[in-house]
Every structure is written in structure tokens, then in C-alpha cells.
Amino acid sequence: MELTPREKDKLLLFTAALLAERRLARGLKLNYPESVALISAFIMEGARDGKSVAALMEEGRHVLSREQVMEGIPEMIPDIQVEATFPDGSKLVTVHNPII
């Protein structure tokens, strides 16, 4: 199976998000890469489901809370930008202050 670099990036992001979900389920606090991966995967899956950019910008702020991440992580992530594939093409989704 041949994958493009973009497809490889998506698979890596999905794998990191899956790991983050498992760690959250065990009661662990997420670090920076896990937090970014989980929110990014949420946005990409929402785009695939047909949600609007505006809806994902708002919903992306409620994926994680401060209590679910390590100390200092919310300040390290002022915004997250994800190029997601929507039914009508690729669009850039920006989530400001994603961990509240």
C-alpha cells in the first residue's frame, strides 16, 4: 500500500489521538503533543462528518479542559490550525484558546 505524505501525517495524528484517548481513560493528564493530536483529530473527524468550520471552531474549544492536561499546557497552545477535508474541499480550521 502506497500512502502520500499527507495520508501518512493523518495516520500518525490519528494514532497519537488514539493514544491520548486511552491515557485520558486511565485518568492520566495529557502532555502537549497528546493534547494537540486529540483536538486536531476531533476537528478532522468533524470535517469528515460534514460539520461546518464555524461549528468546529466552537466545538474544538470543548474537547479538553484544564483539568485533563498537565500544568502549563493550556498556555502553550494559544491556537490550533488544522487543514481538514470537508465534503466541498479542504479548509483551514483555527481554534483559538482550545483548552479552557
Swiss-Prot record:
Cell compartments where the protein resides: Cytoplasm
SUPFAM superfamilies given in the database record: Urease, gamma-subunit (SSF54111)
Pathway: Nitrogen metabolism; urea degradation; CO(2) and NH(3) from urea (urease route): step 1/1
GO MF entries: nickel cation binding; urease activity
InterPro entries in the record: Urease_gamma (IPR012010), Urease_gamma/gamma-beta_su (IPR002026), Urease_gamma_sf (IPR036463), Urease_subunit (IPR050069)
Keywords, ordered alphabetically: Cytoplasm, Hydrolase
Primary enzyme class: hydrolase
Transmembrane helix in keyword set: no
Record GO biological process: urea catabolic process
Highest taxon, organism lineage: Bacteria
Catalytic activity: urea + 2 H2O + H(+) = hydrogencarbonate + 2 NH4(+)
Keyword Cytoplasm on entry: yes
Subunit architecture: Heterotrimer of UreA (gamma), UreB (beta) and UreC (alpha) subunits. Three heterotrimers associate to form the active enzyme.
Name this polypeptide is given: Urease subunit gamma
